[in-house]
């Protein structure tokens, strides 16, 4: 994963990323607050279920793609055996 490094200090990098996240997400929170105020308990439970279900699916996808990328890496043992044969 490519990570942008803003400064040499990891804590400052974390704060910059946190600030960028807050700036990006704040309009969504502000615009959706009216809808949140009118939400019933049933709606909240349904939303929690959807969020949890989405998280589980993303978790599974992450590990599937991690396994696929590991399979694409060349096997170091085979390259070592080839070097010994030569």
Curated annotation (Swiss-Prot):
NCBIfam families: PRK13718.1
Organism: Escherichia coli (strain K12)
Function field: Not determined yet. Not required for conjugation transfer in rich, aerobic growth media.
Gene Ontology terms: cellular component: plasma membrane
Compartments (UniProt record): Cell inner membrane
Protein topology in the membrane: Multi-pass membrane protein
Keywords: Cell inner membrane, Cell membrane, Membrane, Plasmid, Transmembrane, Transmembrane helix
Stated name of the protein: Protein TrbE
Predominant cellular place of this UniProt entry's protein: membrane
Transmembrane segments: 11-31, 45-65
One Pfam family, short name: TrbE
């Amino acid at each position: 994963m490519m990570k942008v490094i803003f400064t040499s200090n990891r804590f400052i990098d974390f704060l910059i990323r946190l600030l960028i996240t807050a700036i990006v997400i704040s309009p969504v929170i502000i615009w959706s607050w009216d809808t949140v105020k009118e939400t019933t308990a049933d709606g909240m439970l349904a939303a929690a279920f959807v969020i949890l279900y989405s998280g589980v699916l993303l978790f599974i996808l992450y590990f599937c793609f991690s396994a696929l990328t590991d399979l694409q890496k060349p096997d170091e043992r085979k390259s070592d055996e080839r070097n010994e044969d030569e």
